Structures are given as C-alpha cells and as structure tokens.
Amino acid sequence: MWKEFKEFAMKGNVIDLAIGVVIGGAFGKIVTSLVNDIIMPVVGSLVGKVDFSNLYINLSGQQFNSLQEAQAAGAATINYGLFLNNLINFLIIAFSIFIVIKQINKLKNFTKKKEEVKVEATEKDCPYCYTKIDIKATRCPHCTSVLEEATN
C-alpha cells in the first residue's frame, strides 16, 4: 500500500496540483493586500474618504462607531463593505486566472500547429466514375477506365 501511495504522490499531476495550491494561496494573499491596502483606499478617497472595510448595516438598533465595536458587542450586522472588498478581490483573481489560462491555451495551440505533420494524399478521385482510388493507380478498379496520368 505504501508503494502505491508513493507512486500516486510522485506522479506529475499530484505534484503540479500541490505546487498550484501553494502558489495560489500566496497569490491570493498578494491580491487581498492589493485590494485592501492599495485599491480600496484610493476608491474610498475618491468617493469621500470612505473606509469600505468599515461599511455595514446595523441590525441591532444600537449605535456603534465602527464595525469592530458592533462585532465586539455581538450585534447583528450586514457587512457590505467587506463584501465589496472580497468581490473586488475575487474579480482580480478571476481575471488573472483568465489571462493565464488564455496564454496557456495560446501556447498549446502554437505547439500543436508545429507538431502537425503534413499528411500526403493517398487517394484521388477517378475522373470518370468519381470514386476514390489509390493515387498511383493507372486504371480505375471500379469503372476500368484507363487514367491518363498517375499523379504523385
């Protein structure tokens, strides 16, 4: 059983997946920082110095100065500012993955076109009965017509 597990774990796909998960986690942290520390402060200052991470709807009826105070008091809140941050975070990650996948597909298609081997014709049409015959034939096996040229 250990041998089978070792073979499974050492296959290229499993290792590639593990590397992808680690890199994806690190990339997610970078994008989260980009959204929270760079994009949202700029957007917030453009719309009137608003901190999006502190935008919420208080459902408890009490007054709180910040989302953190409301959460510490156990108040029910709808945290739409955090949702906006996460939505922008998702859109950036989704767009980045789209660009990467698009480039990978372009590279695959480019290499596939290079690998395509030019296929030589092995058949031709008889000019008299229009059936497929060997390209080197001098006489049609179907209608027995003599062909003028054997094309190669």
UniProtKB/Swiss-Prot annotation:
Keywords assigned: Cell membrane, Ion channel, Ion transport, Membrane, Transmembrane, Transmembrane helix, Transport
Compartment(s) of residence: Cell membrane
Protein role: Channel that opens in response to stretch forces in the membrane lipid bilayer. May participate in the regulation of osmotic pressure changes within the cell.
The protein's name in its UniProt record: Large-conductance mechanosensitive channel
The keyword Cell wall biogenesis/degradation is annotated on this UniProt entry: no
Description of how the protein assembles with itself and partners: Homopentamer.
Location (main, coarse): membrane
Keyword Cell cycle applies: no
Lineage: Bacteria, Bacillati, Bacillota, Clostridia, Eubacteriales
Membrane-spanning ranges: 14-34, 81-101
Cellular component, GO, one term: plasma membrane
Classification via Pfam families: MscL (PF01741)
Membrane topology classification: Multi-pass membrane protein
InterPro entries: Mechanosensitive_channel_CS, MS_channel, MSC/AndL, MscL_channel
Native species: Clostridium perfringens (strain ATCC 13124 / DSM 756 / JCM 1290 / NCIMB 6125 / NCTC 8237 / Type A)
Single GO MF descriptor: mechanosensitive monoatomic ion channel activity
PANTHER family linked: LARGE-CONDUCTANCE MECHANOSENSITIVE CHANNEL, MECHANOSENSITIVE CHANNEL MSCL
PROSITE patterns on file: MSCL (PS01327)
Disulfide cross-links: none
Family to which this protein belongs: Belongs to the MscL family.
